[in-house]
Amino acid sequence: MATATSHQSVVSFASLRSSPSSTISQCGFKIDSSLSFTSKKTNFCKIKAMASSVSYDNTLLSPSKTIPDNSQKKSNEAALILIRHGESLWNEKNLFTGCVDVPLTEKGVEEAIEAGKRISNIPVDVIFTSSLIRAQMTAMLAMIQHRRKKVPIILHDESEQAKTWSQVFSDETKNQSIPVIPAWQLNERMYGELQGLNKQETAERYGKEQVHEWRRSYDIPPPKGESLEMCAERAVAYFQDNIEPKLAAGKNVMIAAHGNSLRSIIMYLDKLTCQEVISLELSTGIPLLYIFKEGKFMKRGSPVGPTEAGVYAYTKRLAQYRQKLEDDSEVLCA
């Protein structure tokens, strides 16, 4: 497995925005119906290796969102938390879910709450989620457990009217809130004609080898669906354009999303190869912590619990944040 300091090539996203295989639709994209059961090979099975662990390549950012030079010079440190949503109703039923919008099970709700307890002492300034309810439920339930007790508020920018109607006019209330930004680009991989089918029955119908290829290969999509490679195109591009600039500015970010969109982002952060990422498994409701500093991502694993000493020993800033929470709590109890 590649480490955070290796310089292996992974996937190149030079042509992300001009991919001919997808266009935006209700689920965020529409898969070209010309896709077949065979691989639709593309040129970007290699991510550009960078001089630092993860550094900026401004050619991949849109001009309006290019990170200013002064933000790159700052030595801001920021936390990045990744959480796969809790168990969904279709996870429980062993169905292919993809972009079908199904809620959490009771177990999934408990997983989201437990995830929140694990990160309750880690600062969060902004939350990104997919546009799917299971990821949004996970984000909201997790943040309810945070010791700062700030209220997560979903931002609606789908229209000017939606923006106006959901406006908050109290500065005090705004200061006690955390913005939640939904993005279809963080949605689960679209499973095409497999969505809603039972996984076991699908294996019996098409053969175990064929279904395994659809599910675990990097560049072979299911019928009229996305490959992991195609999912990575949109997820990593969104991360580079919208999330990395927040981290560079010192904002602490949480992402609540899905197995394949998060695997894509981790592939980028950890510089995994195409072969390494297909064996990466993410459990539901388990948070992963990264520290972003001086243009580099440092993987810190998963917090075992809110009082795990190791999480706060990683950086002086996290230790100070936790101590402030303790001091504030003592003042309130006095």
Swiss-Prot record:
SUPFAM superfamilies: Phosphoglycerate mutase-like. It comes from Arabidopsis thaliana. InterPro entries: His_Pase_superF_clade-1 (IPR013078), His_PPase_superfam (IPR029033), PG/BPGM_mutase_AS (IPR001345), Phosphogly_mut1 (IPR005952). This is 2,3-bisphosphoglycerate-dependent phosphoglycerate mutase 1. Substrate binds at residues 84-91, 97-98, 134, 188-191, 199, 215-216, 259-260. Its main location: plastid. Pathway: Carbohydrate degradation; glycolysis; pyruvate from D-glyceraldehyde 3-phosphate: step 3/5. Catalyzes the interconversion of 2-phosphoglycerate and 3-phosphoglycerate. Residues 1-48 form a transit peptide. One of its GO terms (cellular component) is chloroplast. The keyword RNA-binding does not apply. The active site is at H85, E188. It catalyses: (2R)-2-phosphoglycerate = (2R)-3-phosphoglycerate. Its EC number is 5.4.2.11. Belongs to the phosphoglycerate mutase family. BPG-dependent PGAM subfamily. It is found in: Plastid, Chloroplast. The gene is gpmA1. One of its GO terms (molecular function) is phosphoglycerate mutase activity. Keywords: Chloroplast, Gluconeogenesis, Glycolysis, Isomerase, Plastid, Transit peptide. The record marks H258 as: Transition state stabilizer. GO terms for biological process: gluconeogenesis; glycolytic process. Gene3D superfamilies: Phosphoglycerate mutase-like. The keyword Magnesium does not apply.
